């Protein structure tokens, strides 16, 4: 899953990247996916539920797709690098998901843990 806002950020840096180009299955809007805690449940459409398990680690294939793009997917942070190329999760409940469906996040109880890089 990738947040749609990332594509605008990348375009501003000169990269022509559209939804689906980076291999994501779902593109969201209005959710800062990479900042959600581990174990967050995302409800998509009427019945699908995904549990967030980690951050997508940018691999060398991203640079093969667009030269220099891999480095743009990494932000420096005091706790170490943070990846911004989406999140990974496991399906907890299946269901039909179509473009335009709502996505709702349910975060776990505190204390929260950051999504690990996978």
Language-model features: locations:
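Metal-cofactor-dependent catalytic cores
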Residues: 1-118
């Amino acid at each position: 899953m990738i947040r749609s806002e990332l594509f605008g950020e990348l375009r501003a840096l000169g990269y022509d990247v559209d939804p689906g180009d980076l291999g994501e299955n779902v593109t969201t809007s209005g959710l800062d996916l990479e900042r959600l805690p581990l174990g967050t449940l995302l409800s998509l459409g009427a019945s699908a539920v995904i549990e967030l398990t980690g951050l997508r680690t940018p691999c060398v294939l991203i640079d093969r797709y667009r030269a220099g793009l891999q480095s743009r997917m990494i932000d420096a942070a005091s706790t170490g690098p943070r990846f911004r190329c989406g999140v990974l999760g496991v399906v907890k409940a299946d269901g039909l998901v179509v473009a335009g469906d709502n996505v709702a996040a349910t975060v776990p109880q505190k204390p929260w843990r950051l999504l690990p890089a996978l």
